[in-house]
Amino acid sequence: VSIPQFPKLDGDIHTDVLIIGGGITGVLTAYFLHQNGVKYALVEKSRICSGVTCKTTAKITAQHGLVYHKILADRGAYLSQKYLKANELALEKYCEICKNFDCDFERKDNYVYSVYNRRILEKEMKALEKIRSKAEFCENIIIPKKTVGAVKFPNQAQFNPIKFIAKISEGLNIFEETFVSEMIGTTAVTQNGKIYADKVIAATHFPFINKHGNYFLKLYQHRSYAVALKNAQNIDGMYVDENRKGMSFRNYGKLLLLGGGGHR
């Protein structure tokens, strides 16, 4: 897949909205602003889609682990429903956009399983029932691992994010190899010029300017691994362990992708 290349910033510019970060969040933001006629600029310190986005297992789902019982306990039913609805709308928006591009978009069921903790699955299901989710409890799932059950979100999706970015980035106002070294209000200072903006959207993986929270002291490197197996079974869905140290599974074409082994 060939991702379009974009020039470096060369001199000062003015824009209504500055987006910092060229992963899927930043590029999608630029895409929507472009569609709506808003003057914008996106800057990326290296190449777009060269960080987290190009290494993801690329599941699009409103199911982010077993989070709904926690949100329900902390925020109540109304905000839990809002969170669910927002993510369902985002999924449908992806579906709408992907109709126009070849990016291997497929609707698939998503499962969060547990190897030993059935109680946490049942707790999550009770929360999902309270907020009227379409989730289902599954006693048995088709993965090469013994489980005690799974929470299923039907009709979620998977895709190829590199193919997706390659298509939606065409024609966007992007500057690559443009590193923001300092923010002065809403003005970004780079090695090749300043960007004067009315609004700034930070779409980087972590805070890049040390303002509040001293995040640079709290950050740590986390690594996980993925392998692609040939001649493996078709599991017809996307699966992830509720335990952070567990494994994820999904098919891509004739391959079976296995992820896991996360550690600091």
Annotate the PLM regions.
Residues 1-17, 35:
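Extreme N-terminal leader/targeting segments of oxidoreductases
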